[in-house]
Design a protein with these regions (language model features):
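Hydrophobic core of transmembrane alpha-helices in multi-pass small-molecule transporters
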Residues: 20, 88, 99-116, 302-318
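Transmembrane alpha-helix termini and helix-breaking/packing motifs in multi-pass membrane transporters
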Residues: 34-35, 39, 150-171, 245-247, ...
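Helix-loop boundary and gating motifs at the non-cytosolic
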Residues: 2-60, 216-259
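Helix-loop junctions on the cytosolic side of multi-pass membrane transporters
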Residues: 169-172, 176, 180-199, 385-391
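C-terminal ends and interior cores of transmembrane alpha-helices
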Residues: 83-97, 287-301
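Primarily marks hydrophobic transmembrane alpha-helices of the MFS/SLC 12-helix fold
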Residues: 78, 282-283
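Juxtamembrane intracellular "pre-TM" segments in multi-pass secondary transporters
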Residues: 1-9, 188-224
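Cytoplasmic helix-loop-helix junction between adjacent transmembrane helices
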Residues: 107-147
Length: 391
């Protein structure tokens, strides 16, 4: 990790610092968010409504936010995202007496996630390409930063909630200020292409962007690869608690298990960083994800151990996919492309959750996991072969 950080440019280090403080502030009260809202008097239906509003706002605004970033400046949009997140947490932490206020806070929360997508990250990628640096180093360092901040935030939030309650949000607000300052210190050179785009209207930007996407099959296959990844991600994140509860694991250990799953990201990133990846190895990892978990058919208890193994293998693949995305993204529409990928993931997530829920109803959660993981492996294998063919 230290080696990767040292290799980064000044701007890349500042972006990593901004992401670290921003994600730490976001996750600090995140582990106890449901408990906090319940204690404020909201019921589970209202909490589900808040989550739905968050997802809808993030999905609807993500692609437009990428276009805004390409048109008006990625640094400015990133800083706007931090300010929006600051306002959201301020309302949640200190003005949570009324449901309408919290609902508006979740609208801001979803908007902040959308605004952040493909902003300073795209600037760093362009800077690395200009200086002919290895994008993998930045991608790995960024993954380490996000994983560590999530783990630290989740642990500290769980430990300090009983003593601090809503004051945890005050710490988050201070961390957001640090993230804003780190982003403000970034200085990126403006290319001639950026100056030309500033003179174009939003409609023209959309028209040209879709023409670029239509004429490039690798970009389309890259979007499909990220959409296929939701066949693994959504069942894992949304249903692992159910799987472990049915396996006899007490709920009181779920906080520790959550942190352990975050650590799986770190392990997967380490493996990817240390291994020289070939297309053949990546395909082996993709198939192993489903094949290894399929052994849980032998014993339900075995699934509790095999799921983390599958998660580690997935993160190895996903890290590789993230690097590929940064390499093939069109320079003139990088933020728009990153946001379009995020939008496709959001839509695919809804489909994945529907498939998972249907499978659980008919075959049970263990077999549902196996079905979804094999669907992920098959779809990813086909899309990856098509991507390599037209690359």
């Amino acid at each position: 990790m230290t080696k990767n950080i040292k290799y980064l440019t000044r701007n890349a280090k500042l972006v990593c610092a901004a992401d670290f403080f921003g994600n730490l502030g976001r996750t600090f009260p995140h582990a106890i968010l449901t408990i906090f809202l319940l204690e404020q008097g909201f019921d589970l239906v209202q909490i589900a409504t808040l989550q739905s509003v968050f997802m809808i706002v993030a999905m609807v605004t993500e692609f437009p936010s990428g276009i805004w970033a390409d048109l008006f400046g990625r640094k400015q949009i990133y800083m706007a995202a931090v300010v929006t997140l600051f306002c959201s947490y301020l309302l949640i932490g200190f003005f949570s007496d009324h449901f309408i206020v919290i609902l508006f806070a979740y609208v801001l929360y979803g908007l902040s996630v959308a605004l952040k997508s493909g902003t300073l990250e795209a600037e760093v990628v362009l800077e690395f390409e200009k200086e002919q640096r290895d994008i993998k180093a930045y991608s790995v360092a960024s993954s380490y930063v996000m994983s560590i901040s999530s783990i630290v935030g989740g642990l500290l939030g769980s430990l300090f909630y009983e003593k601090m309650h809503s004051y945890m949000y005050a710490i988050s607000l201070m961390l957001f200020v640090l993230a804003f300052l780190m982003a403000a210190l970034c200085v990126f050179s403006q290319t001639s292409g950026q100056k030309e785009r500033e003179q174009r209207h939003l409609r023209d930007e959309l028209k040209v962007g879709f023409c670029v996407l239509k004429s490039s099959k690798p970009l389309l296959y890259m979007i499909l690869l990220f959409a296929s990844a939701t066949l693994f991600v959504q069942p894992f994140f949304q249903y692992w608690q159910v799987l472990y509860q049915q396996g006899g694991i007490p709920v009181r250990y779920f906080g520790i298990i959550y942190v352990a799953f975050q650590a799986c990201n770190l392990v997967g990133t380490m493996i990817y960083n240390r291994m020289k990846m070939s297309n053949k190895k990546i395909m082996i990892f993709v198939w192993l994800i489903a094949i290894i978990f399929a052994f849980s058919m032998i014993n339900t208890q075995l699934a509790l151990f095999l799921l983390p193994v599958s998660v580690i293998l997935f993160y190895v693949f996903y890290q590789h996919l993230d690097v590929l995305q940064k390499k093939v993204a069109p320079k003139q529409f990088m933020s728009s492309f990153f946001s379009l990928v995020g939008t496709s993931e959001n839509i695919a997530s809804i489909v994945s959750l529907f498939i998972m829920a249907t499978c659980i109803e008919y075959v049970g959660i263990t077999y549902a996991y196996i079905i979804l993981f094999f669907m992920f492996s098959v779809c990813t294998y086909i899309c990856y072969l098509l991507f390599l063919k037209d690359k």
